[in-house]
Each structure stands twice: as structure tokens, then as C-alpha cells.
């Protein structure tokens, strides 16, 4: 239904508004689990305005979800390193890249992405959790203790903190 509403709007608009409609269309396609179509929608993104990093991030997510992880990770890496990109979006791109790399059993590359996430940002706890999992997946259980122990100082209602609280006893038992 959302796509039907956006279709005539997209045809009649120009410039920034057209870019916004294009991004909304891609987000709707992602929500409908149509990542190939979402990636294609954002493939020709030419705008250089403030929306570009968001379009690139969402295209990267669509590429990863559509089975093209190498292309998606390359784009996530670009967004995650770009100083023009807003810091929270850089963190989110690095978080997405880190967890994608954990899924493909590349813990060392994942750890590098998690290490780029700011400790004072909105994705800090998820980044610390991921850093711990990257260390654990690489067989460095003692290295997982650092980020997970740091998480225990955060509010316990955070799911990343809860997961670390569950993982810590296992790691302690294995390393003693």
C-alpha cells in the first residue's frame, strides 16, 4: 500500500523531494523483505545532500540482505569511515558491518568494525557486546571479558547488558 502511494508522488517530484520519496520507497521495500528491489531503488543515488549517507547505509543493508555481502560491507565500510556522515550513522554502519562479519565467521574483521563505534554514542552497548563476541569467536575468551565487564556498569534494562551478564559466567568458567 505504501508503495502504491509513493508511485505517483515519485513521478511528479524533482530534486530533494524526489530523493526523499526514493529513500522512502527503498525503506518500504526493505520492510516488505524485498532487499533486491530496495538496493536497485537506491543504486542510482546521485544527490550529494545530507540524505546521501542515509541512502548509502540503507543500500548497504539491502545488499547484505539480498545475498551480496561483499558489496554491502564495502558500502558500510565507506559510510562507517566517512567524516561527513553523522557520527551516530557511522556507528550504526560499523555495528551492522560488525554483526554481518560475525555471521560470516570473520571475527577479526568484525572486531575492527566494533572498535570504530564511539563509547558515548547510542550504539555503544551493542558495539561492546559485539566486540566481546568477536573476541570469543576468535578464541580469545579473556579478551571478551573487557567489553562485557564494561557493559555490567550500564543500566540492566539494556538487552546488550543482559546478554553480557549471561555470557560472563561462562567465560569466567572457561578461563579459570
Question: Which residue ranges define each predicted feature?
Answer:
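Acidic, polar-rich low-complexity tracts and alpha-helical solenoid repeat scaffolds
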Residues: 1-176
